[in-house]
Curated annotation (Swiss-Prot):
The modification Phosphotyrosine is found at residue 185. A motif (TXY) lies at residues 183-185. This is Mitogen-activated protein kinase 12. It comes from Mus musculus (Mouse). Its EC number is 2.7.11.24. It catalyses: L-seryl-[protein] + ATP = O-phospho-L-seryl-[protein] + ADP + H(+); L-threonyl-[protein] + ATP = O-phospho-L-threonyl-[protein] + ADP + H(+). ATP binds at residues 33-41, 56. Dually phosphorylated on Thr-183 and Tyr-185 by MAP2K3/MKK3 and MAP2K6/MKK6, which activates the enzyme. Ubiquitinated. Ubiquitination leads to degradation by the proteasome pathway.
């Protein structure tokens, strides 16, 4: 058997959990951090700055058109996002020297240390920390939504947190219907808005606000708010608190099946949120009542939620940069595998890092 060619100049090879990694020599001390449905993550130290970074390697991104399309979208979304509460790219590189050889690329992002799910398992969060974390979630969402992107799968596990309680939203805009077909992974539905779980209608950005409400309630009580065993059980759990919706809401549902189901439900009164959320301040309860509304059209937006009195002590409107619209017209084009490869390779090569690797992006460039 012939041995593999030597690593590209300026790169080195290392095996990490039975996978060959070939990374730029500036990234030292590769340590496995975790792996998911689509890729693995290592921490490393950027030898130029001494900063710890996270490097993600996608599993065989060009194994099919579907995987290639997803990899391309992830790269373009990460390149687009420049906000302190949204994960963005510090670097992207490929060890492959030409388009013909192109099979892998690596995404370099800030290293955050933990996620909100792990944090909640290990400690009870004070009201101040809850307020600061929710404020950052909403700032990140306001920016993502202004870019025209919907997260679709916000949950504690994809909210990265560092030791200073600074939060960044991960994996935005990637949760598409193809996920379970591609990987067999079942998506957690406990944080998903009812209109997403049941495919009621074309959903809007407020699906993410529902998720923030579920996460905020869990931080306050230490318990998952709506823990259904399946789709319909999830809806029952939700309605035990929100009550059954009025007839005018049921009329808006686009699916006849959903309409019939809703009309057949026994009537449930809305619960007083303060009784469910013991220990929560009146302002926190009021904010949650505006987030956890069955009718998505009546739900508060991220921009509106940020003006709520609950955040009065934190709000800094100067600190809410505007986003440029993300152009997703490229993402849904039908392309051959070779074409996906070509456009992805072009995106990798055209990446320009933030002014200083590892530095916070200055406000005037945070567009």
């Amino acid at each position: 058997m012939s041995s593999p060619p030597p690593a590209r100049k300026g790169f080195y090879r290392q095996e990490v959990t039975k996978t060959a990694w070939e990374v730029r020599a500036v990234y030292q001390d590769l340590q496995p951090v975790g792996s998911g449905a689509y890729g693995a993550v290592c921490s490393a130290v950027d030898s130029r700055t001494g900063n710890k970074v996270a490097i993600k390697k996608l599993y065989r991104p060009f194994q099919s058109e579907l995987f290639a399309k997803r990899a391309y979208r992830e790269l373009r979304l990460l390149k687009h996002m420049r906000h302190e509460n949204v994960i963005g790219l510090l670097d992207v590189f490929t060890p492959d020297e030409s388009l013909d050889d192109f099979t892998d690329f690596y995404l370099v992002m800030p290293f955050m240390g933990t996620d909100l799910g792990k944090l909640m398992k290990h400690e009870t969060l004070s009201e101040d920390r809850i307020q600061f974390l929710v404020y950052q979630m909403l700032k990140g969402l306001k920016y993502i939504h202004a870019a025209g992107v919907i997260h679709r799968d916000l949950k504690p596990g994809n909210l990265a947190v560092n030791e200073d309680c600074e939060l960044k939203i991960l994996d935005f805009g990637l949760a598409r219907q193809a996920d379970s077909e591609m990987t067999g992974y079942v998506v957690t539905r406990w944080y998903r808005a009812p209109e997403v779980i049941l495919n009621w209608m074309r959903y809007t950005q407020t699906v993410d606000i529902w998720s923030v409400g579920c996460i905020m309630a869990e931080m306050i009580t230490g318990k998952i708010l709506f823990k259904g065993n399946d789709h319909l059980d999830q809806l029952k759990e939700i309605m035990k608190i929100t009550g059954t919706p009025p007839p005018e809401f049921v009329q808006k549902l686009q699916s006849a099946e959903a309409k019939n189901y809703m009309e057949g439900l026994p009537e449930l009164e809305k619960k007083d949120f303060a009784s469910v959320l013991t220990n929560a301040s009146p302002q926190a309860v009021n904010l949650l009542e505006r987030m956890l509304v069955l009718d998505a059209e009546q739900r508060v937006t991220a921009a509106e939620a940020l003006t709520h009195p609950y955040f009065e002590s934190l709000r800094d409107t100067e600190d809410e940069p505007k986003a440029q619209k993300y152009d997703d017209s490229f993402d849904d084009v039908d392309r051959t595998l070779e074409e996906w490869k070509r456009v992805t390779y072009k995106e990798v090569l055209s990446f320009k890092p933030p002014r200083q690797l590892g530095a916070r992006v200055p406000k005037e460039t945070a567009l």
